[in-house]
Amino acid sequence: MGLLFVTVGSTKFDDLIETVCSEGFQNRALTHGYDSWVVQFGSSTCRCIGNIDRSKIELLAFDYNDNIDDYFAIADLIISHGGTGSILDGIRGPAFLEKRDSIPKVVVVPNHSLLHDHQSQICEKLHEQGVVDMKTLNRLHEIFNREDSEYRKLNLCNDSVFKNLLTEFLS
């Protein structure tokens, strides 16, 4: 049993929620053992959460939660919008290593509709560094085509690793 955690942070990202709620995505996730889902839908107005097959998927869905770190800590796969805060929560694996055996796979989906498409830049840089996998909405299903061993993990317990990455990004 694998836990899939989807988060859109405080934004409205209906397209991401609709994509993960689609029958095709559900089937792929189930085939790969993700039968427990937590979906944080933020200010989304879509009603597609009801399309998730609860006879096959254990589901917890909410707009906001004061204890969201708990879900980052236990997820096996994190699908996040491209917000820097959410990405950092997903990749800061060492903070959670006391609670878990491994760092989760983190997949980011930039929300291109936001001002100046600002999420794409940080997502692309982190993807280039092998920290996260980055997908567009229409290619999100491809995350199930990769073996777990293909995901590179970056240990961010050393603050200098993150500082160097951030400095490179900003320069």
Question: Where is each model-derived feature located?
Answer:
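Nucleotide-activated sugar donor-binding and catalytic core shared by glycosyltransferases
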Residues: 1-171
